[in-house]
Amino acid sequence: MTAFSSPSSNAASSATDRYQPLALEERWQALWKEQRLYETQDPKPGQRAFYALSMFPYPSGTLHMGHVRNYVITDVIARVQRMRGDAVLHPMGWDAFGLPAENAAIERKIEPGVWTDSNIAQMRGQLGRLGLSIDWDREVATCHSDYYRWTQWLFLELHAGGLAYQKDATVNWDPVDQTVLANEQVDADGRSWRSGALVEKRDLRQWFLRITDYADALLDDLDQLQGWPERVRTMQANWIGRSIGAEIDFQVEAHPGTSITVFTTRPDTLFGVSYLVLAPDHALVDQLTTSEERISVTAFRDLMAELSQDERTSDDQPKRGVPTGAVAINPANGKSIPIWIADYVLADYGTGAVMGVPAHDVRDFSFARQHELPVQRVIEVSGTNEHVNDGEAWAGPGTLIHSAGFSGLSNDEAKTAITNHGAENGWARAKRQYRLRDWLISRQRYWGCPIPIIHCDDCGAVPVPRDQLPVELPTGIDLKGAGGSPLARAEDWVSVTCPKCGKPARRETDTMDTFMCSSWYYLRFADPHNRDLPFNATSVNRWLPVKQYVGGIEHAILHLLYARFFTKALNDRDLLQTKEPFERLLTQGMVQGTTYRNPRTGRYISPAAVKDESNPLDPDDGGPLEVLFEKMSKSKHNGVDPAAVIDRYGADTARMFILFKAPPEKDLEWDDADVEGQFRFLQRLWRLVDSEVNHDGVSPATGESDSDIRRAVHQAIKAVSEDLSDDFQFNTAISELMKLSNSLSSGLAQASPGVRQEAMSALVRLLAPFAPHLAEEFWQRLGGEDSVHCQPWPDHDPEALVLASIEVVIQVKGKVRGSMSVAADCSKEELERLALASDVAQRWLEGKPPRRVIVVPGKLVNLVPSS
């Protein structure tokens, strides 16, 4: 960064009597850009590195208020840390691959890259108007080959480490977007996270990453993330879903050598198993189903194929199932038990089979009663007077009964004992089970990062040599074909020679899940111009982990989990030192706008159609409308265009409102009146600074006025500094600025020149992170050197907070009778002496000594008369 210099036509000389934000903001933005004010500087010896990062946006072309809130929050944090002396990295980029661009390109008959680059240019300009302290020299776009070259390089690195592999799998197929979805991209209703279509199941050969290899590390290391919201850590823990128990093998009668393996967290209940249940699509169902049950099993499986996972496993309906006719042997006692298939067992969870213990599992009990299956109690409640009815299941602790040699053990003791017994006899083993599945990264779409693999009939799947990266996307191909990847139709691109044997071969035509590119972008920002590697270890280790990450809670499982996996995997390959990418995480709340909804039809009405806001009525049926605050969206007619707000009030007002209206983690309700209120506050500051700039230098300063002003200033410094540490209570920090401005407006004129200068310097520096343009203007008009954003954050002076004198109440028999002004550090003995000598004591004690004197230092003296 070059030495900062204000415009040659001094800001003060161009100032007017009115606050005109647009011209002022444009002028300072141009100067900051010209002088590269926010260019990242490597930390000096002893200087802390602070990496502040917002989750980078998809370039839709339009900035919305959710974006504004995210980026302004991060910007304030970056600005404060820079003023506190840290070396700050605050970059921005674009998560630019994905289906929306591909679909838009098909609709407009242009290349997705053209559409995306146009949107990036538009959004970059919109972000620029917010006055963000971003180092644009580090900008990246995941759709540009100089970025996705390194996504491919990292894929090959994971492939070399055995973490990337291909297999045939039953996958989630989106029939609208014509692509495969990861499990995390299918909601609880079985619908695609993006298109909303009901997801179908298909068998395809797909690429996966072994995220399950890191399940324990991903779960256990959540305890280290004390700077993350507890809600996010809980969501990740539940998604990983570690269960500790045992795998148990049940042999199948009449099928020698065939066994069914179940996973259970309750091996202590093994003697109570009265049936087994398989998932309808379990691999053994066809083999085990008898001819007598074939028709009913086939019909049931067809029915299950039409239902979503949520519909199958919902607790709101009875559990459905049919017998296969096959029988298994309980290895613990040799008893024969029937094998069923049921809706609530899923093939891709656990082993796809469960053991039914109706006496000690509520769901199993319901299923057994419904289908008249036997119930055998094997756990007895012990140590309590609690009675378990025959008509209910007991899932709590107790003592084993009816369990052969294990009877009398506590259920915790029995878990280990029965598992060990099974292990000794070859039918059980201790096991950890996870809900987490390997990450499916194949996508049958065009606009994504090509997978750098070549398929050879002789050599199999061969990695593209790294010196041949990037494998670039071809242009000019038909994107509209149904089914399969559009890349498969680019024959000239697909046909290559095998790097291993030189024979004809074909490129992989699937592209990567867009989350592949966003799982490591924070690393590239540390070294964005490196042409030899995705990042240099020295640069990454200098800046990582990200000190403060800001983004929506909707990314709690997908992006944040994948990024943690990537970091751990790359750490294991000695590419970086940190094992966690983000030290602190702030999940900002949504920005909500007023909606008008017809409760009779569910239709949302445009605010423009509502004539009377105090009594909103539907213009069509005349009935009353519900007035709600909901997340801004086009369909609900409640969006607010950031550009329109900036055009009317300026970026500083928009920033101040966003920060003041609600704590960052809470939802924010948009209110035009409050926006206007912030604009008026900035106007008051303008007049305050204008008054100081035009002050004649003469003041009737007194020691008392100076101490009052300094006390107000240093109280504000202390309070704002605390509000901007850890919890980031921007709203209360701005409240403190308002209090300070009120104090200065009423008392500054009576202060000495030195105190006035101290007060205004502190006010402007405290304002700088929130309203950077106006603070810069004020700083220059007040004669400050360099940029205000290069100034040190003010420190409060504890001595300035000490009051010179205080008022102490005098009570007689507990009733207030007067007060006295005393030194703030007045001792208890001195307070008693002064109270007894006061006119109040002379009047109410009538010259008699009190029976008792109660002194509360700093607050009151209570005189208790002798009679």
UniProtKB/Swiss-Prot annotation:
Q: Does the keyword Ribonucleoprotein apply?
A: no
Domain of life of the organism in this record? Bacteria
Cite the entry's keywords alphabetically: Aminoacyl-tRNA synthetase, ATP-binding, Cytoplasm, Ligase, Nucleotide-binding, Protein biosynthesis
Q: According to its UniProt record, where is this protein mainly located? A: cytoplasm
Catalysed reactions, semicolon-separated:
tRNA(Leu) + L-leucine + ATP = L-leucyl-tRNA(Leu) + AMP + diphosphate
Please state where this protein is localized: Cytoplasm
Where along the chain is composition biased (Basic and acidic residues)? 309-319
Give residue numbers for sequence motif 'KMSKS' region. Answer: 631-635
In the record, biological process GO terms are:
leucyl-tRNA aminoacylation
List residues binding ATP: 634
Motif 'HIGH' region, which positions?
57-67
Provide an example Pfam family for this protein: tRNA-synt_1g
Annotated region described as Disordered, given as residue ranges: 308-327
Q: Does this UniProt record's set of keywords contain rRNA processing?
A: no
- GO CC term, one of those recorded: cytosol
Tell me the HAMAP family matching this sequence. Leu_tRNA_synth_B
Listed name of the protein: Leucine--tRNA ligase
UniProt organism field: Synechococcus sp. (strain CC9311)
Q: What is the lineage of its organism?
A: Bacteria, Bacillati, Cyanobacteriota, Cyanophyceae, Synechococcales
